[in-house]
Amino acid sequence: MTLLLLPLLLASLLASCSCNKANKHKPWIEAEYQGIVMENDNTVLLNPPLFALDKDAPLRYAGEICGFRLHGSGVPFEAVILDKATGEGLIRAKEPVDCEAQKEHTFTIQAYDCGEGPDGANTKKSHKATVHVRVNDVNEFAPVFVERLYRAAVTEGKLYDRILRVEAIDGDCSPQYSQICYYEILTPNTPFLIDNDGNIENTEKLQYSGERLYKFTVTAYDCGKKRAADDAEVEIQVKPTCKPSWQGWNKRIEYAPGAGSLALFPGIRLETCDEPLWNIQATIELQTSHVAKGCDRDNYSERALRKLCGAATGEVDLLPMPGPNANWTAGLSVHYSQDSSLIYWFNGTQAVQVPLGGPSGLGSGPQDSLSDHFTLSFWMKHGVTPNKGKKEEETIVCNTVQNEDGFSHYSLTVHGCRIAFLYWPLLESARPVKFLWKLEQVCDDEWHHYALNLEFPTVTLYTDGISFDPALIHDNGLIHPPRREPALMIGACWTEEKNKEKEKGDNSTDTTQGDPLSIHHYFHGYLAGFSVRSGRLESREVIECLYACREGLDYRDFESLGKGMKVHVNPSQSLLTLEGDDVETFNHALQHVAYMNTLRFATPGVRPLRLTTAVKCFSEESCVSIPEVEGYVVVLQPDAPQILLSGTAHFARPAVDFEGTNGVPLFPDLQITCSISHQVEAKKDESWQGTVTDTRMSDEIVHNLDGCEISLVGDDLDPERESLLLDTTSLQQRGLELTNTSAYLTIAGVESITVYEEILRQARYRLRHGAALYTRKFRLSCSEMNGRYSSNEFIVEVNVLHSMNRVAHPSHVLSSQQFLHRGHQPPPEMAGHSLASSHRNSMIPSAATLIIVVCVGFLVLMVVLGLVRIHSLHRRVSGAGGPPGASSDPKDPDLFWDDSALTIIVNPMESYQNRQSCVTGAVGGQQEDEDSSDSEVADSPSSDERRIIETPPHRY
């Protein structure tokens, strides 16, 4: 039997060896394949067909093809085996392909056999063949016009080869389907023709007297004869015979604050109707007189603006608001400007005399009045009065000053469009000097600011922040000197020395009322902000910062300014003049004239705009005339800044912290941020449930504040028990004003947000020792731009934690309210040991609070039961010899009470342990509190010691 099995075993071993060595050849495929797949289809047609051959065939496994592998990044195809024996395969797309996304795909393919057995061992792979698959286009897209509406204009009586061109595009990928083969006008009976390229021409001459606007519809066809999904509309306007004018400008120009420089006429061009010109002059005028005082300026108050610009202090207001200390302005007519500043109207018969010396005058005495170094600053609106002669002067200010050497005198007057400054250094010996300026601002009846710097013999006049040197300087030695007595008058001046005798009998009241014998040269116009600063001059930079206009016409494209072009801008930037000799160069220059407003929060509204043009032609007989252009700039409403106050809104501290010298900070972690929210375009594919009407985003900006207020929510402060504290030294160093009352505390003055944060974090709340206050709420709010923008109201609630052993209660009955406080007070028997614990855990979770209340209530119940038991015991012990005043009613023996002070003897350790067990069951992790309590329990009375418990007063 053994001999028979051996040959079988040897045969099986030989067969096994022969199978392992049967897979000798690799599969073979073509080196390259070309494939075609139709768009939106899966099957790829290959040339040649996909077949893999193996020389090991017909052996099983070794001669069979098990599959194909594709190699390449992101190949959207897959290869499948159709017949393992023949090696036939198929390439197909994983999903329908899109020709518009990708027209061709290239990758490699490799075949592999089934190896030497079912487990695929010793599998062999073929070489890698390259496969090129082209996606055949399907005419799935219709032509689409680039514009839905085409407009053009033609002049009457002309035939045009091309009026305009319409254009359509096709989204298909192949040239056959993506090209537009022809266009067609669908509207019948139109005098127009369109070619295959979309060019439209007129077939007859059009007349302005006939139809002035032609409307018709145009469609397009691709080379697959697919028509456009949406047709295009064409409008052709017929214009009359050419008239010289400006073309391509918009009447309304919108300006968004913060946009910088905005071109006013970006597409403007001059139509000359082929008339040759040799000179063109255009003037652009921007009208801003209706905006505040003549133009858009900083919206801060005068005082805040002086601080921002770095102006020195010490100026004296000569025309203050009428009041007890400034009664000299009471007789003038008072108005208010758009920025709420005070304006005085002088009607030509009024003047005011400013008192010298004293608390309400200029300086402490005449010797402190103006010297030969001073700055006069004022706003003036003045026009030429029709009923007054052009030769009559009007006095703005007239002043005679007494000094150590004698008297000096000066006056500032207007005379038509001239402004004059007369200075007499010394009436006794020196000759007067008169400085003259001729300015159109003086008589244009618009608001302008004037600042005059005197540093004799130098005098500089600033108008709207722009300096002007005197046009003429006269040595006037023939005029009569004024009377020698100190006086300061605004709106007129007194007569010369020869009339002094007539004036001696007149008092100051009569003088200011305008006695014709003593007062002359009255001023007719408006004055505001009239101040003087003696001994030191305002610098040019400060004056420019304070009063220069922040809006105006602008031109910066000097580099590309053509040859022969001239540009001139007036000092106030309200008038710009262009001059040139070439039309195209002139058009280019005018297209770069811009409006600019440097204010972040510009004053919204309309600024009228006017363009006037004068031309000179080679032929005067046929010279053209260019009509005036009028439009307006609309300054849009600026995005308001959002001032956000944030920080800790609620905190609790022990009473000893509030009773300290410095109190407790109210806003220790205050954060002030300023941001601007502006509208952005919402994405169309944005997932939003509902209707999207506005999408906004916020950009944080660096900004200033001009005031903050801390007020009380509820009753005012009681000065005898509480107060608000703030370091006045730091406020004075920064030029801020502090007002502290029982109802509020205000800080006024322009400073950065960082400085206000630092100051407000130092605001403290202090209590007097023993004050029984438990809760206070404070409201903080800030503002900016002279109160134009305000912050949110940030409310802080403060809890004062009192120890219950610090106060006494007159009642002998203990109640749950006497053991429970909003600040989570400890039980009275541990009041002296739980201050630190209550401070650290003033905010106990609500569940723990409920358990504590239950425990305390249980404790109170036990105390009440103890009282009843003590009372019964006391009755049995006392018997008939009770205390005086005891009840002797035999019907109600249990209602006997002792009128003396109630004394309760309890075990403090037992009640404290009961309460601690309740808290431990509700709130874990209070190890710190337990340690502090345990450390103090060691010093508490022992169980056999007695302790007197006094109930606290009821304060709720």
From Swiss-Prot:
PROSITE patterns the UniProt entry points to: CADHERIN_2
Glycosylated sites: N299, N327, N347, N507, N740
Mode of membrane association: Single-pass type I membrane protein
Gene Ontology CC terms, in alphabetical order: cell surface; dendrite; endoplasmic reticulum membrane; GABA-ergic synapse; glutamatergic synapse; Golgi membrane; lipid droplet; organelle membrane contact site
InterPro entries for this protein: Cadherin-like_dom (IPR002126), Cadherin-like_sf (IPR015919), CLSTN_C (IPR045588), ConA-like_dom_sf (IPR013320)
Principal place of residence: membrane
Topology feature Extracellular, residues: 20-847
Example GO biological process: inhibitory synapse assembly
Annotated Acidic residues bias: 927-937
Written domain comment of the UniProt record: The cytoplasmic domain binds synaptic Ca(2+).
Quaternary state and interactors: Interacts (via cadherin domains) with both alpha and beta isoforms of neurexins (NRXN1, NRXN2 and NRXN3). Directly interacts with APBA2. Forms a tripartite complex with APBA2 and APP. Interacts with low affinity with KLC1. Interacts with SLC23A2/SVCT2.
Protein role: Postsynaptic adhesion molecule that binds to presynaptic neurexins to mediate both excitatory and inhibitory synapse formation. Promotes synapse development by acting as a cell adhesion molecule at the postsynaptic membrane, which associates with both neurexin-alpha and neurexin-beta proteins at the presynaptic membrane. Regulates the balance between excitatory and inhibitory synapses by inhibiting formation of excitatory parallel-fiber synapses and promoting formation of inhibitory synapses in the same neuron.
The protein, known as: Calsyntenin-3
Biological source species: Homo sapiens
Gene behind this protein: CLSTN3
